[in-house]
């Protein structure tokens, strides 16, 4: 049975995640407030950040940066694209 939540990212009722996707309190907040579409959008944005900025998830400072961007992207809608990033043609 699907779980319906009000998604803070999409600003509408939508299908919630099936599991807590991130550790700690932030993971619980994401599980409670972010839907599947919002989480998929974050994963795509995170991949772009890792690739464009040459980040390593093993580096603690890079992980801290990604967590900060996760908060901005999902809850503040203010995450920026990397400097010099050009959107691919659709």
UniProtKB/Swiss-Prot annotation:
Source taxon at top rank: Bacteria
GO biological process, one term: cellular response to oxidative stress
Pfam families given in the database record: Iron_traffic (PF04362)
Keyword Nucleus: no
Keywords, alphabetical: Iron
Family annotation (SUPFAM superfamilies): YggX-like
Purpose of the protein: Could be a mediator in iron transactions between iron acquisition and iron-requiring processes, such as synthesis and/or repair of Fe-S clusters in biosynthetic enzymes.
Family named by the database record: Belongs to the Fe(2+)-trafficking protein family.
Protein name per UniProt: Probable Fe(2+)-trafficking protein
């Amino acid at each position: 049975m699907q779980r319906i939540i009000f998604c803070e990212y999409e600003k509408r009722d939508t299908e919630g995640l099936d599991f807590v996707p991130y550790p700690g309190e932030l993971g619980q907040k994401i599980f409670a407030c972010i839907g599947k579409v919002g989480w998929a959008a974050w994963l795509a944005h995170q991949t772009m950040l890792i690739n464009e900025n040459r980040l390593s998830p093993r580096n603690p400072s890079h992980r801290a940066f990604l967590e900060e961007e996760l908060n901005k992207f999902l809850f503040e809608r203010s995450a920026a694209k990397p400097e010099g990033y050009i959107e691919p043609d659709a």
